[in-house]
């Protein structure tokens, strides 16, 4: 019989906001701070909100205008409740605001520094490695990890709770950042213990929350928990489908699965297995399974949300820039692709114009707020061979864009995917297909064209490698195309970003 395993999940608390506080010499648990690029519109999403601001009812991924409105509302209430209906100061510190109810709530809006967050995350991972071997750690995101600690508890003579506390306090001592942890008998249980149960647990003096679950305590504590979207892997779409059967808790899902599992498989396919297992608190995946996993198919993806609605031509410029960057990324990774996909999302206001509304005959859908919006344009383009050529990939994207994008509408989101990505050595072997001759065609001309194309691709490849070398040595903006200076181009700005935010 397999021994029961013990897993720990650790989530760094309001990570980006905590890093910004630490860099300013401030206490992350006592400082009102949001990480947001105020140079963008107030609709920009806050990447992080400090715990003290969350205590005022501000969501962790609120939009900036929601923060502004909530703080304004809170300050109006403070002003009204003040003895003279006036505010006599302001502060960004939670303890001062608690002591002075007639002060205005203030906050810092810190621009994101993605390279800095990566540095902190790397340092914290190094601290985890003092206690746990890399083969027993899975990095889930920049601020979250899973650990299989089963084989460490006996040698450390600690419980999982004690080990979690020790690691978190080591991180706090060396970085100033605290964390929340979940402990479970499988990967799913430690995750939901951290995400749901720990949020309602009492904090210690360092702001640390730790919760533990096994299959039975999971059923007692969380079978009646709402909403379902709080649970790992259940999004709004899945929750809506389950609600059609009157299922709004994990307990109801577990009971439903006893007699109606074929219906769940019909609705969700293979994902029904995860839903049913998780409803009962089961998870068969082990750390060794994660480490051994190798995807069958590989792809490279690039996407961006434009800062304002773009015209058809401006959107084409951005799509071409992205195609060029994708090709360079393939060259850098020594990969090639034979299939390109383009998805273009339209701006919500595209149909506000009565003339456009009258002329537009394309498909529509509803956004999450129930508003009628044009349906995202989507198309694929099979290439004639495996390639990393910027010329061929840009041509493919340009053709796709012209074919699928409606010039009447404003563009807001662009995503490009290179599918069937394989190593270039294998790709070159796949490309070595003989030229098929035809008695009724000029075969010599066909040979000559194929040879000329090979020379052009070889010449372009040398140029791409030289471009990458220059960019590595002197910065990404040291060598640019004329395209990058066209109206609407975003490439130069994105070269100074990581993940769409300032580095």
Predicted regions: what is each one?
Residues 1-503:
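Basic, low-complexity intrinsically disordered segments
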């Amino acid at each position: 019989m397999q021994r029961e395993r013990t897993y720990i999940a650790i989530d760094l608390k309001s990570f980006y906001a905590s890093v910004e506080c630490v860099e300013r010499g401030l206490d992350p648990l006592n400082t009102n701070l949001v990480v947001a690029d105020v140079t963008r519109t107030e609709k920009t999403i806050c990447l992080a909100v400090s715990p003290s601001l969350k205590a005022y009812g501000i969501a962790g991924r609120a939009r900036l205008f929601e923060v502004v409105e909530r703080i304004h509302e809170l300050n109006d209430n403070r002003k009204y409740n003040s003895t003279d209906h006036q505010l006599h100061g302001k502060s960004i510190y939670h303890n001062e605001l608690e002591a002075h109810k007639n002060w205005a709530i203030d906050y810092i809006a810190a621009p994101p520094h993605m390279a800095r967050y990566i540095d902190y995350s790397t340092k914290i991972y190094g601290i985890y490695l003092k206690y746990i071997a890399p083969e027993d750690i899975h990095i889930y995101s920049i601020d979250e990890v899973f650990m299989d600690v089963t084989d460490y508890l006996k040698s450390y003579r600690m419980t999982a709770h004690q080990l979690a506390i020790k690691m978190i306090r080591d991180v706090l001592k060396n970085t100033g950042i605290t964390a929340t942890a979940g402990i479970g008998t499988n990967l799913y249980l430690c995750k939901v213990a951290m995400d749901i149960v720990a949020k309602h647990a009492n904090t210690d003096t360092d702001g640390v929350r730790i919760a533990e679950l096994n299959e039975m305590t999971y059923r007692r504590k969380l079978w009646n928990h709402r909403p379902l979207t709080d649970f790992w892997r259940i999004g709004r779409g899945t929750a809506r489908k389950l609600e059609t059967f009157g299922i709004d808790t994990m307990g109801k899902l577990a009971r439903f699965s006893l007699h109606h599992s074929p219906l769940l498989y019909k609705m969700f396919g293979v994902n029904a297995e995860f839903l049913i297992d998780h409803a009962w608190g089961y998870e068969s995946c082990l750390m060794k399974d994660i480490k051994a996993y190798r995807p069958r198919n590989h792809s490279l993806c690039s996407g961006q949300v434009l800062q304002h609605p773009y015209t058809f031509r401006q959107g084409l410029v951005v799509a071409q820039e992205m195609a060029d960057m994708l090709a360079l990324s393939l060259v850098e990774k020594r990969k090639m692709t034979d299939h390109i996909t383009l998805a273009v999302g339209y701006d919500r206001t595209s149909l506000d114009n009565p003339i456009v509304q009258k002329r537009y005959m394309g498909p529509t859908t509803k956004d999450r707020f129930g508003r009628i919006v044009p349906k995202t344009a989507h198309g694929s383009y099979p290439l004639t061979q495996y390639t990393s050529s910027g010329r061929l990939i840009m041509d493919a994207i340009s053709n796709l864009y012209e074919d699928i994008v409606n010039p009447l509408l404003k563009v807001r989101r662009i995503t490009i995917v290179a599918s069937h990505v394989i190593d270039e050595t294998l790709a070159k072997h796949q490309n070595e297909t003989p030229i098929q001759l035809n008695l009724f065609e000029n075969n010599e001309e066909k040979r000559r064209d194929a040879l000329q194309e090979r020379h052009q691709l070889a010449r372009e490849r040398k140029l791409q490698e030289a471009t990458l070398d220059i960019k590595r040595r002197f910065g990404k903006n040291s060598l640019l195309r004329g395209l990058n200076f066209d109206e609407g181009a975003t490439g130069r700005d994105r070269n100074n970003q990581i993940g769409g935010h300032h580095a």
